[in-house]
């Protein structure tokens, strides 16, 4: 995240795969090897495309400047030197980052990786690793090739895929019998909002995307921790195997409810701020697409509240659940920072928004000329961007 050298970024983009591969492959579930290999192949394939694009970009900039450099600022300044290669280089960067996000239809590795990964692996994957994809779009793919990224055709594809991810992820989550897989598909839906906000191109929408990236780490990380805690006690992730556990695990049920409501986007909790800013900021650019995206919020409420109702508010009718113990001191200490972050970001997001304002404003200014030359991004689902 802090690399200002494209070579350093690529090296650590690849290095991230190694520990996650072993976390899933060694300490994962029954199908851990399948999930680990699938995760590795998907992300490595995208990374190799990005490597080719980096080499081509650096070589073309060298022909213009005379310097063989991976410096971010210098490459950004002279990225226009790639000329007719720009669409191909953007495609290579975009595929690599879309796999990492993941954007539909590159998402199929994520549910398997989450389900088979141990709790710590799922938390790390959701809270940190998925964000490198959306960060890559914000930091490299769009700023390097704005004329391509914000062209009507590419914008149409990205916004449509974001909408599919939002709605598809929510609908698939709604029918999941496995609580961990439900949370995994909810990530596909949430990160669709991030992509919509990035292409929304306004200060509000880009800030909203960054806020969702931060909030998703708190909320989804907390959900995976809670799923892991109850799994240690019951050794099942099937929602139907629970029911009425609020009577024997009141603290767990209270925390799970708060975290689920934050993931839904309840006002006063962290999830609301980012989604509201994305929808507010994207409406001027893509009004119809933004209205369609709001259905994802409704579906999120449906699948999470329904899961809560089945897990903690039904009758306590299974003998195995009567023996469950509530969260201990160690587990409460572990959850406390996440709960503080969830509430703090929901009630007082101003310091975070102020901290990111200069970077988001620079991104908007950097991409504004390309938006002005391509004022209509999605036929039938967009409006002109104000100059």
Where do the protein language model's features map onto the residues?
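Alpha-helical multi-pass transmembrane bundles of energy-transducing inner-membrane proteins
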Residues: 1-85, 172-185, 191-238
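Glycine- and aromatic-enriched alpha-helical transmembrane segments of multi-pass membrane proteins
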Residues: 326-353, 387
């Amino acid at each position: 995240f802090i690399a200002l050298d494209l070579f350093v970024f690529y090296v650590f983009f690849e290095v991230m795969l190694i520990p996650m591969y072993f976390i899933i492959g060694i300490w994962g579930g029954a199908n851990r090897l399948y999930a680990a290999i699938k995760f590795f192949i998907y992300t490595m394939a995208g990374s190799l495309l990005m490597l080719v694009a980096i080499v081509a970009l650096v070589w073309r900039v060298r022909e213009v400047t005379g310097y063989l450099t991976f410096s971010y600022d210098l490459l950004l300044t002279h990225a226009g030197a790639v000329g007719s290669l720009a669409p191909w280089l953007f495609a290579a960067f975009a595929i690599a980052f879309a796999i990492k996000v993941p954007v539909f239809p590159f998402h199929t590795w994520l549910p398997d990786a989450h389900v088979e990964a141990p709790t710590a692996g799922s938390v790390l994957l959701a809270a940190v690793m998925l964000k490198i994809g959306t960060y890559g779009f914000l930091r490299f793919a769009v700023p390097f090739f704005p004329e391509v990224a914000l062209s009507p055709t590419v914008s149409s594809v990205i916004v449509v895929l974001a909408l599919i991810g939002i709605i598809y992820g929510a609908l698939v989550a709604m029918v999941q019998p496995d609580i961990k897989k439900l949370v995994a598909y909810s990530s596909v839906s949430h990160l669709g909002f991030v992509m919509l906000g990035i292409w929304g191109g306004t200060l509000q929408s880009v800030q909203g995307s960054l806020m969702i990236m931060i909030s998703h780490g708190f909320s989804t990380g907390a959900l995976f921790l809670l799923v892991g805690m109850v799994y240690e006690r019951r050794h099942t992730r099937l929602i139907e195997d629970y029911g009425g556990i609020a009577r024997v695990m009141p603290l767990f049920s209270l925390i799970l409810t708060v975290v689920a409501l934050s993931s839904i986007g309840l006002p006063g909790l962290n999830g609301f701020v980012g989604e509201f800013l994305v929808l507010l900021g994207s409406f001027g650019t893509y009004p119809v697409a933004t209205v369609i995206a709001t259905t994802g919020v409704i579906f999120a409420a449906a699948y999470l509240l329904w899961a809560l109702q089945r897990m903690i508010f039904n009758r306590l009718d299974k003998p195995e659940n009567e023996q469950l113990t509530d969260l201990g001191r160690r587990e409460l200490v572990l959850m406390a920072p996440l709960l503080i972050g969830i509430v703090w970001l929901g009630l007082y997001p101003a310091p975070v928004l102020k901290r990111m304002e200069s970077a988001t404003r620079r991104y908007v200014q950097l991409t504004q000329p390309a938006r002005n030359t391509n004022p209509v991004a999605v036929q039938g689902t967009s409006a002109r961007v104000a100059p």
